[in-house]
Amino acid sequence: MNLCADSSTGELALFQGQDGGSIPTSAHQFIVRPISKLTANRFIERHHYLGITPFLSTYRYGAYFGDLIYGAIAFGTPNATDISGLFSKNNQDGVLEIKRLAMTDSAPKNSESRFIAISVRLLRREYPLRLLVTYADSSLHVGTIYKASGFEYVGLTATKCDFWVNGKINQRGKVSHLDGKWVPRSQKHLFLKSFSP
């Protein structure tokens, strides 16, 4: 498969056959490029099961076919308490997390794993990536795309609870004065992928 990089635009173009039609029929037809926070958030809000639940990201990429975006991926620094059992506090340089990954339902088979691979190649041009962390919600997924992308399965995370008030998660602050309840959160499948410098 031909890969060509255009370092001036930060794009990594995937081979696109002639007369490919107006919709992608192969994951190889996408062009992956950096996108703005706004573009990523709008796409993720529409296509990710969590919607726009707050998350912090530093690097974001989109999968395009022509002018249409079919996927968005966001990378950011992992929450230090979430990965504290994996590394010492002084050993977290070069560690990022896939904060969100979303693709349209009309994206061709294997699009997610290919999109991850190309996005990581672009990311490594901007950031000295040593380790990539990602999670799959055990109530919805088993992490097939991460396994297909070469991630190592570590296991399930510890059970956590969220405080719910009026049908919504109370994200921050004191809860003792609120009329709500603690609800167990589904565990997450934890995956890691390491990279040599």
Q: What kind of region is each of these model predictions?
A:
Residues S8-T9, G21:
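Short, positively charged low-complexity motifs
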Residues L14-T58:
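Short amphipathic alpha-helix that is part of the acyltransferase structural core
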Residues I31-I35, G76-V183:
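Acyl-donor binding region in acyl/amide transferases
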Residues T58, S186-F191:
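Short hydrophobic/aromatic beta-strand or adjacent loop that forms the aromatic wall/cage
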